[in-house]
Amino acid sequence: DLETTGTSPRRNSIIEISAVKVSNHEIVDTFSTLVNPECEIPYAATAVNGITDEMVADMPCIEEVFPLFMDFVGDEILIGHNINNFDMKYLWKVAEHLYGETVTNDYVDTLPMSRQKLPELAHHRLVDLAAHYSISTEGAHRALADCIMNQKCYELMLAEVPSGEAKKCPKCGNIMKRRNGRYGEFWGCMGF
């Protein structure tokens, strides 16, 4: 997961980069560091992630951090929420700048995965997904906390009924249907 000075990889910079290694459904190692963007962090970015200029002032720049990050992830599959439209674009930009080549790791984006597996959710932000699974959102929008939150959500989504298969009622086993209710859509059963 990345925290940045803004949403455009062309104009903005990474200010925090984190990853977790997972083996047998357990986090076995972590990588996390703040990054000095060598520019002022806009107020809007600090409002989202809480990272200030003072916090990054004595931290290494991306040229120092990126090789360490890539050594940590190696050729592993990267998993992130909105990784396709956000994180990978920053990683590709930095790799191109530093090495003249791109990051070639395969990756899984949990945002479209959540839309497919959990169509009943009104929103599919990482914090919404975590709330759906009753996972703590403490520290949200800090890179390491988001990595841990996303790993838990990913594991739980893998256990969801595959898209296209019928969801069954846990009480009676009948097939449930998506219904519209007073407070929005929900999955309901009339069999018990």
Regions found by a protein language model. Name each.
Residues 104-115:
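A short, structured active-site edge motif that brings together acidic residues
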Residues 2-92, 96-105, 119-141:
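Conserved non-catalytic scaffold segment of RNase H-like nuclease domains
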